[in-house]
Amino acid sequence: MVLKSVVPLAIAAPVFLFGGNAVDAKPALMSDTIEASEVKAAQDAWCGALVSISKAHTEGGLAMSKPLASGVIDAAYGYQFGPVAFKPTWTKGSTTFRETSAGALSYFVGGDPAFKDSGFAIGTPGSNRSPWVKCKPEIFVIQSFGSTANAMGWVHIEAADGSKSTVDKTFGYLRDDNGNLRIVVHHSSTPFVSN
């Protein structure tokens, strides 16, 4: 078996073929490249889902918000491929990382005694919670590597009571077999505040 290296079009990393002739190779790698516009659309959709989950919870509690959040997680995240590297903002200790969809669902809407979450998507923290009514991503970096991409920036959220928050976000995306972007890395934290 002969190992040959081919660099198709603008891809810098080598593609290895076993056997065959490199002249006959017709890699279709570039058609799978995730575009910046797709990443922006995915982040806009994530923000829209956050506001929708919050609204559903305001209107019908967990009975409405939990099924919606579950559907959002199934559609937007890549848990069907295996563990997702998800580090939410409002977590700590042994339940900081949410590699399962059950952990993600608890983080977004609460109601799972295994995680003891208050539900980030429901609204502002504390006892006098206010639902999220606006969410806008501000992306600083998009890196695209064929069928995967990374994005880093802020998400600005606003509650019905007028309170605002900015969260640092890093998302890693994988294109699935149907062409949809799936979140496989999601790191979230609050910006550093000096004393």
PLM regions and their residue ranges:
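Bacterial N-terminal signal peptides that target proteins for export
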Residues: M1-L9
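Amphipathic alpha-helical coiled-coil segments
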Residues: P83-V84
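Short, low-complexity N-terminal intrinsically disordered segments enriched in polar/charged residues
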Residues: V23-Y79
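Surface-exposed, charged secondary-structure patches
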Residues: K87-E158
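Short beta-strand edge/turn micro-motifs at domain boundaries
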Residues: S144-M152, H156, D161-N195
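Conserved aromatic-histidine-acidic binding/catalytic patches
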Residues: S31-I34, E38, I139, Q143, ...
